[in-house]
């Protein structure tokens, strides 16, 4: 299996809306041309109001999720306050850069809400971190997802509008990218809560998108 197949075979999305951020992924995991799993988890909660999406090697992604969760909790214990989204992306960036000689095969998004409001960062395998403006997509399905996101995104989306946009963009990627598929996982982060969209609500939003 090539590095490109390992690193990019998925679709993950981040959308900033008026009151928070949406992190969304599909659920297919591949090994070359084979579908290895139809229920892969690609969004992890690493702090109270911060999530991380993963594309790339499953083992690398899971280890990084564990490390980030521990480090973010330690930050809160030591400093008496929650880590910011920017600080968490810097923490992840530094860790990946220190291991660049034996890199983690991942492409990540870190998004959440802190005292400055909602934000999302993309982080590559070498530790390069970039704060994205409003929308971002990673993985092999990202070109198709970006086509929908850039066409339909507008400032100050409501939560419902942002969820529908994420689902629409993922469905576009899943139709054309063989490494993306099986289902959709949506996380909503606001200043009040980190929550996952239930299957029942996902079906309702999907019906609205396809109507």
UniProtKB/Swiss-Prot annotation:
UniProt activity-regulation remark: The formation of the proteasomal ATPase PAN-20S proteasome complex, via the docking of the C-termini of PAN into the intersubunit pockets in the alpha-rings, triggers opening of the gate for substrate entry. Interconversion between the open-gate and close-gate conformations leads to a dynamic regulation of the 20S proteasome proteolysis activity.
CC annotations in GO: cytoplasm; proteasome core complex, beta-subunit complex
Reactions that this protein is recorded to catalyse: Cleavage of peptide bonds with very broad specificity
Subcellular location(s) per record: Cytoplasm
Keyword Hydrolase set for record: yes
Source species, domain of life: Archaea
GO MF entries: threonine-type endopeptidase activity
Disulphide-bridged cysteine pairs: none
UniProt-annotated catalytic positions: 10
Its EC number(s): 3.4.25.1
InterPro entries: Ntn_hydrolases_N (IPR029055), Pept_T1A_Psome_bsu_arc (IPR019983), Pept_T1A_subB (IPR000243), Proteasome_bsu_CS (IPR016050), Proteasome_sua/b (IPR001353), Proteasome_suB-type (IPR023333)
Residues that make up the propeptide removed upon maturation: 1-9
Principal cellular location given in the protein's record: cytoplasm
Family: Belongs to the peptidase T1B family.
Quaternary organization: The 20S proteasome core is composed of 14 alpha and 14 beta subunits that assemble into four stacked heptameric rings, resulting in a barrel-shaped structure. The two inner rings, each composed of seven catalytic beta subunits, are sandwiched by two outer rings, each composed of seven alpha subunits. The catalytic chamber with the active sites is on the inside of the barrel. Has a gated structure, the ends of the cylinder being occluded by the N-termini of the alpha-subunits. Is capped at one or both ends by the proteasome regulatory ATPase, PAN.
PANTHER family linked to this entry: METALLOPROTEASE TLDD, PROTEASOME SUBUNIT BETA
Identification of the protein by name: Proteasome subunit beta
Gene field: psmB
